[in-house]
Amino acid sequence: MVLALQANFCLVALEVAGPDGRARLLCTRRTLLAKSGQRICVGDRVRVEAIDWSAGRGVVAALEPRTNLLPRPAVANVSRILVVAALREPDLDPLQLTRFLVTAEASGTAVQVVLSKVDLAPLPDVEAWCERLRGWGYAVHAVSARAGVGIEALRHSLAEPGIVVVCGPSGVGKSSLLNALRPDLELRTAAVSGRLRRGRHTTRHVELFSLGPALVADSPGFNRPELPEDPASLERFFPELRRQLSQQPCRFRNCRHLGDPGCGMAGAWDRQKLYGHCLAELLERGAHGSGQQEEALRQRGDRREPRLNPQLRRGSRRLDRQRLDAALEEDDSGEDR
């Protein structure tokens, strides 16, 4: 399995250790993989050949089929996603958190929420947010890496085999959380920017770390994950909306679930405005994309050479020569007669 990628190399963990007990190899990949467009990602199961045990090197010759692929961060065969959101420093942004949750839901993987830095917020605020997130349909872990709150409970929840991706905005404490779960990692951390109150990027690449039977991926922070492209699919990525519509479907197939008559989501719901914001962005993006396509077609049409009437086109020189030769042969045969 691929544990990490850097430059043109990948670190691969072996299912069976080598003759010298080596369990990891630093590998390149076959040129054929690159030419065929097969991209190696962290979490991929691969076949390694041309092993040099003394140097600890090998070559990735083939990729095994994936169960799934998380696009950002690019991790394959994911079992669970932990979306980390800080209550303070930086303050929790419901829309930003929703974007991360929608992106995670779109992968088809089990999703949970980790509320970090709970020691910096009043207890009523922590409890209110935990209750709110459960209403959204998520299991919640309230933790503080600095105070050690909730760390053991989170470690216990990671006791099953599989790949767990830890993702979230910059500065929410993902690396600090992993350091608390496994102190020997000593991952680099940094304080939130004092002037902008934004997180600083400390993790530069994705890497898998063992945590009991699980493999946990620390990922670089980013603040604006992309939403799925299809507006019609958005409802599937809001668990509370999905749950309600399964019990009380809408009267209309094309309902936007914004409180219109006949909608299964009668009345306001907690994330209605957040859902509406995401939906509006997707609809605007689609309209903008259609407009760009129409404009491109129009401009291309303006440059296109007009099609002439077939009767006015100049004939093919080859066909003209064939007809001329045929006519000459016919004349010759007529003279012979």
Language model regions located:
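Canonical P-loop GTPase G-domain recognition
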Residues: 120-172
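Catalytic P-loop NTPase motifs of RecA-like helicase/translocase cores
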Residues: 91, 121, 149, 223-225
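Switch/coupling subdomain of P-loop NTPase systems
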Residues: 46, 78, 95-109
